[in-house]
């Protein structure tokens, strides 16, 4: 089994939606994924697990029983979407802030593939692309106040800063932290790898920059 990160395409949107439905309470229709990918194709990425055996079992043995024929996380029989980042550029002509900036709409990694550094690498790829392709000066996002793992990633690993608390931001009434990161392209390279699998991901990320 191997894991790689590549730019998301229209062919990935059903698998991306499935990864979203499995992991997050904030869900979107397929047309919303399509809107992002068609409008800002450089800003969204997927993490792919490949090397699936002919019997449908993932050779990486992450504790999953897999069936490519019946599992919508598969793009094809050899590629399983295990995570994604959905990004966009803010383009509201009536907004007071005219500075070009991006927004992370959604980030998700399947539970059995967490703690491999995949979420951080997806984020770095998207942030780099927004900076390089769209000249984004900063990126914003929202995160649930209760989501400690995401807060650790954004605040401690990626150095986002909390700019405000938005009351009852989510449909269930939970507050959100509004966060922001000023983009510096030289700071968006992969972090030091902890093990062989992370090292492969870092190499893949560098090759896509």
Regions found by a protein language model. Give the residues of each.
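Conserved active-site alpha-helix within GNAT-family acetyltransferase domains
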Residues: 116, 120, 132, 145-175
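C-terminal interaction modules of eukaryotic adaptor/scaffold proteins
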Residues: 175-182
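Compact beta-sheet-dominated globular domain cores
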Residues: 191-193
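Conserved hydrophobic beta-strand within the GNAT/NAT acetyltransferase core sheet
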Residues: 104, 139-143
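Acetyl-CoA-dependent GNAT
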Residues: 3, 10-114, 122-134, 182-184, ...
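Conserved SAM-binding loop
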Residues: 5, 115, 143
